[in-house]
């Protein structure tokens, strides 16, 4: 089974949809922090596109732990969130402070609690959490759907890339009891995630290098590869004229 989490009105072909709001008419009505309707290891792919930032911390950790629970070993998880690192750079150097701050806090949601942003992530933060939950083979993913994971938002007359899209494969169960970790995070939400994990496990996250720059290098490689393919096709079209 494949599930598109936090579906709103989007219904991708081949996916069941899940949303907290019955008004969105999803296949499954549920809170992504608690999905008892879905059996352990019953899913082959999950997409959570611009969902996690709408949860408070550490509820977002609890949601990712639930995703790990329902995914089978070898299953694929695709997450997209606003890229805090890029947004902070926009505040510092690109002259778009109101736009960037609005993206961070989810301006436009108004009084709709579920559409407001309550937390944010960098690639490093997501990689730490996903590694603990048993994921690896991290990569970038692209979405053709009409939603935030396609990577672009309009800022005036320009398209701005602000979406952090991470794909990961579940390799094993979490390193220890995720409910215990959730309670520890809840009791001290400002504590560094890696320190809490180091206290409860054999410091696997702290010992292993998880490279955020490597992830971005893969993005750049794919961009260069795509540009080369476009140039190749353009040359063929010129020759055919």
PLM regions: where:
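Short, Lys/Arg-enriched, disordered terminal segments
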Residues: 1, 240-241
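Conserved SAM-binding loop
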Residues: 2-89, 124, 166-170
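S-adenosyl-L-methionine-dependent methyltransferase catalytic module, highlighting the catalytic core
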Residues: 59-62, 66, 72, 76-210
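Heptad-repeat positions
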Residues: 216, 223, 230, 237-240
């Amino acid at each position: 089974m494949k599930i598109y989490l936090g579906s709103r009105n989007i219904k991708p072909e081949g996916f069941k949809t899940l949303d907290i709001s019955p008004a969105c008419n999803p296949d499954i009505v549920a809170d992504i922090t608690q999905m008892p309707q879905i059996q352990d290891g019953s899913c082959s792919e999950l997409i959570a596109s611009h969902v996690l930032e709408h949860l408070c911390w550490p509820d977002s950790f609890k949601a990712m732990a639930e995703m790990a629970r329902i995914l089978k070993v070898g299953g694929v998880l695709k997450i997209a969130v606003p890229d805090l690192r890029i947004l902070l750079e926009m505040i510092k150097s690109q002259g778009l402070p109101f736009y960037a701050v609005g993206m961070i806090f989810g301006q436009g949601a108004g009084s709709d609690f579920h559409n407001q942003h309550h937390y944010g992530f960098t690639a490093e933060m997501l990689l730490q959490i996903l590694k603990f939950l048993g994921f690896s083979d991290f990569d970038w993913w692209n979405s053709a759907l009409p939603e935030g994971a396609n990577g672009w938002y309009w800022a005036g007359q320009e398209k701005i890339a602000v979406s952090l899209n991470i794909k990961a494969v579940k390799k094993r169960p979490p390193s220890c009891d995720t409910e215990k970790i959730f309670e520890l995070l809840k009791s001290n939400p400002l504590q560094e995630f890696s320190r809490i994990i180091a206290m409860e496990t054999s410091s696997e996250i702290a010992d292993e290098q998880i490279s955020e720059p490597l992830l971005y290098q893969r993005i750049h490689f794919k961009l260069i590869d795509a540009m080369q393919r476009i140039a190749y096709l353009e040359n063929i079209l010129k020759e055919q004229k």
